[in-house]
Amino acid sequence: MARKTPIERYRNIGISAHIDAGKTTTTERILYYTGVNHKIGEVHDGAATMDWMAQEQERGITITSAATTCFWKGMDLNFPEHRFNIIDTPGHVDFTIEVERSMRVLDGACMVYCAVGGVQPQSETVWRQATKYKVPRLAFVNKMDRSGANFYKVVDQMKMRLKANPVPIVLPIGAEEGFKGVVDLIKMKAIIWDEASQGMKFEYQDIPAELQGDAETWREQMVEAAAEANEDLMNEYLENGDLSEEKIKLGLRTRTIACEIQPMLCGTAFKNKGVQRMLDAVIEFLPSPVDIPPVAGVDDNEKEVTRKADDKEKFAALAFKLMTDPFVGQLTFVRVYSGVLNSGETVLNSVKNKKERIGRILQMHANEREEIKEVLAGDIAACVGLKEVTTGETLCDPSAPIILERMVFPDPVIHVAVEPKTKGDQEKMGIALGRLAAEDPSFRVRTDEESGQTIISGMGELHLEIIVDRMKREFNVEANVGAPQVAYREAIRKAVEQEGKFVKQSGGRGQYGHVWIKLEPNETGKGYEFVDAIKGGVVPREYIPAVDKGLQETLPNGVLAGFPVVDVKVTLFDGSYHDVDSNENAFKMAASMAFKDAMRKANPILLEPMMAVVVETPEDYMGNVMGDLSGRRGIVQGMDDLPGGMKEIKAEVPLAEMFGYATQLRSLTQGRATYSMEFKHYSEAPKSVAEAVISNRK
């Protein structure tokens, strides 16, 4: 089937922002202007098209990144039709993983900032993720109609806080109540949108006299930024003192795709102004799948291979999201990097080396769907019928295996025990949790061996609350939830050498394993490392993997309180064996015994997760908030002034002290402060805390 849209006219973009910067509203407007939505859905009354899980509508925050397709020809209808795949990303810090997984499959992103709040803590996290995956981006300053709106302040904050290089291509005309439209610095015209047509109609006017000077100054900066794209443009600029519209766009596009600059726009999505110009900027400055380097991966011989964004290449795609749908069961969202996928075809899951048949292929418009027969290179779609695939795995042509770069998911930092309210729901709860864990790799489920309880783990209290809520809504299982538990770890402070001997010789075939190991602290974050330093075959080669395995099986249960052991290096340097009685199991046992004994002598310590906490509070309550953080063993690391008499406090606080913080903060500040927190690192717990934790586990 011929392409309806050439691949050069595809744009796979994410819309990303801090909570309440107006991201979902912005997406809604995009769907409206691109002709998909007839009535605009407002988040205020819980009707936004993109926020499609019932919970999102109640809480007014976006949790799952729904992928939506729409078309755009430019607000002047001056472009050939382009196809946008928009991935909506959540802004809440407990869902950072969702942002990460969408960044992995995007070609470009629109960063939405609030004209009043500016660059907020979560914006910094999202920016870091976009930088990590080298995603070109635009910035859109939203809510220009709100009191306290200041476009230029956000430009400065982007430079200071994000170390970004924003290049405004429009300037606001007026602000707050007086916000009318924008000055287009490329055309040097004012764009005024018509309110009666909900922004569908607009007109170009002359730039208001009072803005002419500013417009010329900012235009010069923009043209200079464009000219730096290459020597030809720079020479032309130096000769003529200006560049043509086309050359400006070419220069800005080149540098945006190289992640050197970020074109910056502004508007108010709620009042239907400015989003239309941003859509044009997506076409002008963000890359199509062929403008970015071919995707890299490894083949079945671990050799690096690349795939170009071309229908003629062999098929390769990344499964970036799983969702359970009430009508069709499990949906697997895929980004196709190369080749073509047809419904009914068999594909290879190269990570698990399993073949699967694709049932139907759907393209989503938020939660409405259209069935399609094939999905082409550069496109995003949802597949039905894949049983074994989990997030981050590669699907490819069985004749040309490739494994694309995997996504790295963080380990959970908080656990709670859950049990169904009625015994009969035990099995149903197991199925529900299994489904939810397949959808979200930062959520884990396990059964505690000692107590038999079901333990769920996640990235924060809100994360787990939402999981429990979804069990009730989607699977009809009500659960009782225990008190949250912290994921402590154990480590060591000094290096020791230790012998381990496992000998059983009582008639018949015996057991004999004997090792000497050196246990020492490893660099933070390095995890477990095994070094084989055996000389002269004192431990035969075939038993060395058994020693490694014996050590690894001992790691989950430390000697202090049974928490997992991290950041240790173990060197096997000596030992002995018996011709008849030695076997793998004996060496596994010997290694395990040596490790436990060594651990006791190596000054074991307890590590606790530390959270980066950012509180925004009115100045009047600052003393209370800081006192409370200190009482939670928090270390305040910095303070900033925010607009409107607000203060921002950055602190590092142990997770163990943060339970129930939301409620406490509300009562300390009469509900006027907000906070966000994300996992930072593990650090040694003070002696008194460690002793209390250890005695509770005994």
UniProtKB/Swiss-Prot annotation:
Residues 8-290 form the tr-type G domain. GTP binds at residues 17-24, 88-92, 142-145. InterPro entries: EFG_II (IPR041095), EFG_III (IPR009022), EFG_III/V (IPR035647), EFG_IV (IPR047872), EFG_V (IPR035649), EFG_V-like (IPR000640), EFTu-like_2 (IPR004161), G_TR_CS (IPR031157). Transmembrane segments: none annotated. The keyword rRNA-binding does not apply. It is found in: Cytoplasm. SMART domains: EFG_C, EFG_IV. Keywords: Cytoplasm, Elongation factor, GTP-binding, Nucleotide-binding, Protein biosynthesis. PANTHER family: RIBOSOME-RELEASING FACTOR 2, MITOCHONDRIAL, TRANSLATION ELONGATION FACTOR G-RELATED. This is Elongation factor G. It comes from Azoarcus sp. (strain BH72). The lineage of its organism: Bacteria, Pseudomonadati, Pseudomonadota, Betaproteobacteria, Rhodocyclales.
